Amino acid sequence: MATVTPNFNWPVPTSTDLVKDGATAIEALGDSIDASLVDLKGGTTGQVLSKTTNADMDFTWVTSDDANAIQNTIVDAKGDLIAATAADTPARLAVGTNGQVLTADSTAATGLAWATASSGSTNVAGKNGVLNSQFNVWQRGTSGSASGTSAGTGYNADRWWNYYAGTMTVSRQATGDTTNLPFIQYCARIQRNSGQTSATSIYHGQDFETLNSIAYAGKTVAFSFYARKGANFSGASSALALSVQSGTGTDQHVLSGFTGSTNPISTSATLTTTWQRFTYTGTIPTDSTQLAVYFTYDGVGTAGANDYFEVTGVQLEIAGSASAYSPNTSTYQAELAACLRYYDKRGGQTGTGTILNNALSNSAGTNAAFNFPVNMRVAPTSVEYASLRLSDTSSGFTVSSVTLTNCTPTTANVNVATTGMTAFRSCYLDSSATGNYIAFSAEL
């Protein structure tokens, strides 16, 4: 008895069929195969089979539409893309250059275009570890002698210390250059005063406290800055030495010596009278807990009127190469707050200005408390003052001394001494002359 094939149900004889029945079954099989393959018959040269319906073996011969297919020749190089200039109109978009990104562009023929990837804002807060790196903050005054000859002395621009055995002046100057500088308004001028003959090294630098240094341990860093020289700069071969120094101690001053000192970057820059940017890289040791950056040169002969160098846009970042300059913070207010952590000055007004109200007098002066707007690095270690007086309801009394008593990083208690006051009167601290101030230091 005939059976059928599993896929097309074609009848086939079985092993039990009689000979005559087998022949009949074979004939039926042939007819079934012929009927199933009828759609494969015919066609002309170049035609291809196309499904007519979803039914099995239901085909139709059709002419190939190669002309409307996307041809291989439309692309010419690795990375080419196929786009369109209109409906049903494919077109080639040539590969871009390394680093470019594909963007929508309605002005382009294909509506697409290659463009340089945005690097984002160049002003990235926190990237640069150097505080007051464009020399905007000068609480101590924008010009002054800086003959500090020991650690912790000779500060002028906030956070920047100076050292020279002779007499030098550090001052804020307008850069006056928007061609070679990225619109930085100010720089520091470090000047060997005219007539000086001391050949000792002149230093200008900044120490990082340990809290801000540890993040650099084991990292590759890029150190960059802008600098130029004065017409009488006496450094040999117009060279300005520079260093990024690391240590393993805690909150030390580099002039006193870092414990475990190393110099991941130590080289020199050749200055001209035009602003240039200098960039250097190095690797901070993995056990580093403190950092400093500084510039130095040895004066030669007798200093002329313009024996100085100027520097600005100083940047230390964790990077394999220097990026565009960015200050530590994004606003002057934030940069000032960062500097107040180390030095807090009150007063400095022209004429009479009140510094502190609501004190209570005794016959020898008063005890006064100052609250800091920003927590200092540590409790202040020194107090500075000038042209102060204590005034009560009837008189003013010149201040003879100000001493720290009980201090914390948030508050300074001071004893303000004078003579001749009447006890238990309300009094206030103000000026006896132009330039009155009181300042608290927690510098390294």
What is the predicted role of each segment?
Residues 2-6, 12-128, 153-155, 302-303:
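Extracellular repetitive beta-rich solenoid segments
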Residues 117-444:
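Extracellular and organelle-lumenal recognition/adhesion modules and their flexible linkers in secreted
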